[in-house]
Amino acid sequence: MSRHFLASLIATMALLSHSISGYTQDTSSAIVISNARIFDGVSEQLIEGKQLLIEDGIITALSEEVRIPEGAMQIDAGGRVLTPGFIDSHAHLMLQLSFGEGFNSDAYYWAYVSTQAAEIYLQNGFTTVRDVSGNSFSLKKAIDRGIVDGPRVFPSGPMISQTSGHSDHRTDAQASAMVADEPAVPMKYDMVQLADGRTEVLKATREALRRGASQIKIAVGGGTGSYADPLDTTQYTPDEIRAAVEAAEDWNTYVTAHVYN
């Protein structure tokens, strides 16, 4: 069995839902899991009759009888199935509110709700998420520091789109983006970002990278979550898309895109 499995193993029948909460932050103590049927993510054959030892977030032993370190947490799986942690490659931890609730809530409420979402992800077996749109930088920091229970987060930061694109959630009652005006709530809280032309796209991309984005998210097609742009629209010019990619490449990372057409 590879030692590169995700540190937290989650039983599919909620075996560890209470005992392992917060383990992604506290990996200093050892955990020994016995009496589990283990799916290693490769073979269809479940591994049985083995004990599994996790030390410092790494699987260090798998045998019929492992060395049990002093003070180790011991878990009897009761014959349940144990799997590697799941990975969600398209998550929105910060975008958990309906439009009506979100537009009438302050940034603190958005943040509180996101902590609940992060814990739910973890309790359902997801130990890693790629967050593709949303101001999840502080949530990631809180999880990494052990303040909040949740999975590892790879944030994109705000999804970047053109004016009238998938990130433009202004209502008809709001003034044009070309004049001074209070931005729509998702833009105000940095969940999404509008950028037009090469210069603005470069700046928006670099700002997300400055905040700690591990990849960049742009929108190049319409969506159901933005009422002003039909699904079949083409958004961003090739040069604008190229600008985002060039800025991301400068940081040795990549651009992912919302695409419907």
Residue ranges of each PLM-predicted region?
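Cleaved targeting-peptide boundary
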Residues: 23-30
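Histidine-rich, glycine-flanked metal-binding segment
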Residues: 26, 38, 43-83
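Metal-coordinating catalytic core of metallo-dependent amide/deamination hydrolases
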Residues: 25, 147-261
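Extracytoplasmic/secreted proteins, especially bacterial periplasmic and envelope-associated proteins
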Residues: 54, 61, 113-120, 134, ...
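Metal-associated gating/positioning segment near the N- to mid-region
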Residues: 80-145, 163-173, 239
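Divalent metal-coordination and catalytic microenvironments
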Residues: 36, 52, 57, 79, ...
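Positively charged n-region of N-terminal signal peptides that target proteins for export
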Residues: 1-5
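Bacterial N-terminal signal peptides
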Residues: 7-21
